[in-house]
Amino acid sequence: MFVPISQIENLAQFKKEIFNGKIYVFEKSKITSHLVDQIKKKIGIDYSGELEKLHHFSNCEEMSTYLVANLKNTEIFKNLFYEFLNSINFLQGESYWDKFVVRVAPAINKFKYREASRIGVHRDTWGTNIHQQINWWAPISSIEETNTMVFFPDYFDRPVKNSSGSWDLNIYLENRKKGDFSYPSAPELLEKLPDNVRILPVTIKPGEILCFSGSHLHSSSKHKSENTRFSYEIRTVCQDDLDSKNEAPNIDCKLKWQFPKIFRNMKDNSPMKITS
């Protein structure tokens, strides 16, 4: 299901396949390797140890939280990612992205801060109600099946009970400004998936980049691990897809509104707007 690719030959066909559930893995390149190196370089200013062994330090939770905040939306990271998107022929017309986030997933799943923790089962589109959203995810350090991202591919077009109908991004953002993380950072799964559910763990290498629809049901793996995971992620939306309603199916998102304001124009940083 993870299809290797180096460059997009036909963007329309590529997006059609993404919005129908296909998951691509872009191969390692000079640009993506340089991006990983730059992230590691900035991490090294504050933490010079082995990334996978951060959890051995007594202050690992505080350090993880600090690193995530300090690395978020770093200009050189976004510039290099833009260069990557251009190199694979993804950029045609106006395009938008959210913040470039470096995430730390602890070896033991006990941290409270969302971007320095493991994430529960969700679709990213539950939080935006924008089904043209494409996700990009990549490891910075080596990963293993006990601490990675996992997909539930049989649920791409199968609904599950979730809290999107009562969740509000504005409430979360307001609480976050006050340092209050008690409100869920995203809508949550409200049912237990079967014990025999098919799970696809991601085992790509640093320098490779995963690309998939934000409508995929996915989560962090739940196992206790010997390694802390460092990864980065960003989401994109293209104006052409908004205009043409080229999108993944909305299976179970019940948000009352759409939340385009988290996306910004890649060129001039203006907020994305959606008109009926």
Task: Please provide the spans of the model-predicted regions.
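N-terminal auxiliary "cap/dimerization" subdomain that precedes the catalytic jelly-roll/cupin core
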Residues: M1-L91, K205, M272-S276
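Short, solvent-exposed loop/turn segments at secondary-structure junctions
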Residues: I31-T32, A107-N109, W126, S141-E144, ...
